[in-house]
Amino acid sequence: KGVMAGGPEAMYRAKENSEDDEDAARKDLEEAGMKKGDLLIGLAASGQTPYVLSGMKKAKEEGALTISISCVEEDKIGEYADIPIRLLCGPEILTGSTRLKAGTAEKMVLNMISTGAFVLCGKVYENLMVDLIPSNSKLVKRETRIVQEATGADEEEAEKALRECSRSAKEAIVMIKLGCDAESAKLALKKAGGFVRKAIKQ
């Protein structure tokens, strides 16, 4: 889940004063159901945005793990972070326009974190996104290619396995790799906690 100063509408219409609303941050996190054991990543290019700072404090009170991402050497949000990340990208070409270098740098770090999380959750096999949802024709074709690349199967065999596995690329890969039926592949994957590599090596 993600919360931001000003709410979702602030994505499309600027609400500059909302970043100073400390109470809103606490309320937003409560509504999001944040609890002990969760992870909160606080982003503020300046390292001192009141909304983010308040959210970091709330997370610490709840016993959540905290990561801060700022673009300055000395920040306030880092004081409340278990893992402070400071991206020293230097001044913006347009003074104060942190959507440029700072925003881009923060987005790159978020990409790294989310990609790592995907790997740790078993959504990746080798370098393939095996847990994608084939919600359009492009993704249906990509899913077939993923099964082919992971197993060495031809298109016909990959498609057959996907149909038998209710379009689950993970199950189709395990099925082909182990030479078993769809139900056995599903069971092997369940025993492996959703990790394709573990399911194949059981």
Locations of regions flagged by a protein language model:
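Glycine-rich phosphate-binding loops that contact phosphosugars or nucleotide phosphates
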Residues: 1-108, 117-121
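Alpha-helix N-cap/loop-to-helix boundary motif
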Residues: 97-105, 109, 128-135, 139
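Short, amphipathic alpha-helical interaction segments embedded in low-complexity terminal/linker regions
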Residues: 117-202
